[in-house]
């Protein structure tokens, strides 16, 4: 968790969101207040802190207007664990498919990665040093003592090829001779000077365990987690370049240097206190007809989500986590249904409502120009790698914005995602030919845009399929 990020004022948070997201000021203000309230809560005494629950947010707006991006960027600002799920992927408890508790387990997995990555960063130098020492031994090996022949009691059960418990890559080696010591010293100097990066070495790496395919998705995952914890890790030999081996070995050594149990406990606390779960397409499980079978199933999913929003103890492979103080953000277009079609108990769990506006021509223009790494800057950077300089005129950008808006009006409104499609189609020929035109300078003008796109954008049938 970013200690500086959580102390940001609402104005600071909105300012950071403005670097990446255009418009939607009301939504930005509300998520900024929700984040600041978490910081305020952390300053209170324990008794008061337990009474204050986060105010969950319901975002209402068509696709492509920034609902997911606002939540994702908000989580990055404070370094909070964030997970996006789709309400339509869940099934009622007892049916085959993902149950709603899986989103909490996924959030904890994200929190564990965040905490461990942070802790690995603190021991990175030591881990790299250990990796370099190991590489020197691999590049200049000495005689190794005979390994123990004790068999693994699980070997016959799992078809062999399981290493003994307690064994690792570093087999005990005999005391190196003076000649080997001298050679290792020379190799170490070359290694640190970066002269051996492409040399091949053989290292042992953990092999991903095979998936269990005979159960439903959720039961499968739980069984897989349990088996992974019980069984020792399979290791296989791979031949890789030194630079790749260093990364793999340094990561393994970093894992050994950090206290795994402490990291897991910190991750559970981080998920509980700072976790953000974004539930997309929540409008698809809303229903205004409780009589049909499909609608009954949707209500079942809503009722399964409800106790998690209220606060439940969920069992994960790292321990039990309490969802009471997690922040939940529901989102949906609500074209067919409306928020009042959600069951009343669930409506009450999303006290903050924010309606996001459809994008205008001006919004599209700003999306193309204002963000820190706008789409146009991305394409310019990509083509610059081929030594092709692309210059977009203001008039061309305006034309692209108008075209994106018009295609959205004439076909399905997919918001800002339409710009990706239009830019990709417009620059398709240039991207293909770029390697054969070094040092070229291409000016993107309104005429260029029209030449590439006008015949398609003005034909509703073509634009529906191509743009």
From Swiss-Prot:
Disordered: region residues: 146-185
Domain of life: Bacteria
InterPro entries (alphabetical): AAA+_ATPase (IPR003593), ATP-dep_Clp_protease_ClpX (IPR050052), ATPase_AAA_core (IPR003959), Clp_ATPase_C (IPR019489), HslU (IPR004491), P-loop_NTPase (IPR027417)
GO molecular function: ATP binding; ATP hydrolysis activity; peptidase activity; proteasome-activating activity
Main location per the UniProt record: cytoplasm
GO biological process: protein unfolding; proteolysis involved in protein catabolic process
Localization of this protein: Cytoplasm
Bias-annotated ranges (Acidic residues): 168-177
Pfam families: AAA, AAA_2, ClpB_D2-small
Residues binding ATP: 22, 64-69, 280, 345, 417
A GO cellular-component term linked to this record: HslUV protease complex
UniProt entry keywords in alphabetical sequence: ATP-binding, Chaperone, Cytoplasm, Nucleotide-binding, Stress response
NCBIfam families: hslU, PRK05201.1
Protein family membership: Belongs to the ClpX chaperone family. HslU subfamily.
Assembly and binders: A double ring-shaped homohexamer of HslV is capped on each side by a ring-shaped HslU homohexamer. The assembly of the HslU/HslV complex is dependent on binding of ATP.
HAMAP family, sorted: HslU (MF_00249)
Function of the protein: ATPase subunit of a proteasome-like degradation complex; this subunit has chaperone activity. The binding of ATP and its subsequent hydrolysis by HslU are essential for unfolding of protein substrates subsequently hydrolyzed by HslV. HslU recognizes the N-terminal part of its protein substrates and unfolds these before they are guided to HslV for hydrolysis.
Name assigned to this protein: ATP-dependent protease ATPase subunit HslU
Source organism per UniProt: Staphylococcus haemolyticus (strain JCSC1435)
């Amino acid at each position: 968790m970013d200690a500086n990020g959580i102390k940001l004022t609402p104005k600071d948070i909105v300012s950071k969101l403005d670097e990446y997201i255009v418009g939607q000021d009301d939504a930005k203000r509300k998520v900024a207040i929700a984040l600041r309230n978490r910081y305020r809560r952390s300053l209170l005494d324990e008794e008061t802190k337990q009474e204050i629950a986060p105010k969950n947010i319901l975002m209402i707006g068509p696709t492509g207007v920034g609902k997911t991006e606002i939540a994702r960027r908000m989580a990055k600002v404070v370094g909070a664990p964030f997970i996006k799920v789709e309400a339509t992927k869940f099934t009622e408890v007892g049916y085959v498919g993902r149950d709603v508790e899986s989103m909490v387990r996924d959030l904890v997995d994200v929190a564990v990665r965040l905490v461990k990555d942070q802790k690995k960063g603190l021991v990175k130098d030591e881990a790299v040093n250990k990796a370099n020492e190991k590489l020197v031994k691999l590049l200049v090996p000495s005689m190794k003592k005979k390994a123990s022949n004790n068999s693994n009691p699980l070997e016959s059960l799992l078809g062999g090829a399981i290493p003994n418990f307690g064994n690792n890559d570093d087999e005990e080696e005999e005391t190196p001779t003076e000649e080997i010591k001298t050679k290792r010293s020379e190799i170490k100097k070359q290694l640190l000077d970066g002269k051996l990066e492409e040399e091949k070495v053989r290292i042992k790496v953990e092999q991903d365990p095979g998936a269990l395919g005979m159960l439903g998705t959720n039961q499968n995952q739980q069984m897989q987690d349990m088996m992974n914890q019980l069984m020792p890790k399979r290791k296989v030999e791979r031949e890789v370049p030194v630079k790749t081996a260093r990364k793999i070995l340094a990561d393994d050594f970093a894992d050994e240097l950090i206290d795994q149990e402490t990291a897991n406990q910190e991750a559970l606390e981080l998920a509980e206190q700072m976790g953000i779960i974004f539930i997309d397409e929540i409008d698809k499980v809303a229903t205004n007809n409780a009589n049909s079978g499909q609608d009954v199933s949707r209500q079942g999913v809503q009722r399964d989500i409800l106790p998690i929003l209220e606060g439940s103890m969920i069992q994960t492979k790292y321990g039990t986590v309490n969802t009471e103080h997690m922040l939940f953000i529901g989102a949906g277009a609500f074209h067919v249904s409306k928020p009042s079609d959600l069951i009343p108990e669930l409506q009450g769990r999303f006290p903050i409502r924010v309606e996001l506006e459809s994008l205008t021509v001006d919004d599209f223009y700003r999306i193309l120009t204002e963000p820190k790494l706008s789409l146009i800057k991305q394409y310019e950077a990509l083509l610059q790698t081929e030594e092709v300089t692309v210059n977009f005129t203001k008039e061309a950008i305006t034309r692209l914005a108008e075209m994106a808006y018009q295609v959205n009006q004439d076909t399905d409104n997919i918001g800002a995602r339409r710009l990706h499609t239009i830019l990709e189609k417009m620059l398709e020929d240039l991207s293909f030919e770029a390697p054969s035109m070094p040092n070229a300078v291409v000016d993107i003008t309104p005429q260029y845009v029209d030449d590439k796109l006008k015949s398609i954008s003005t034909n509703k049938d073509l634009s529906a399929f191509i743009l």
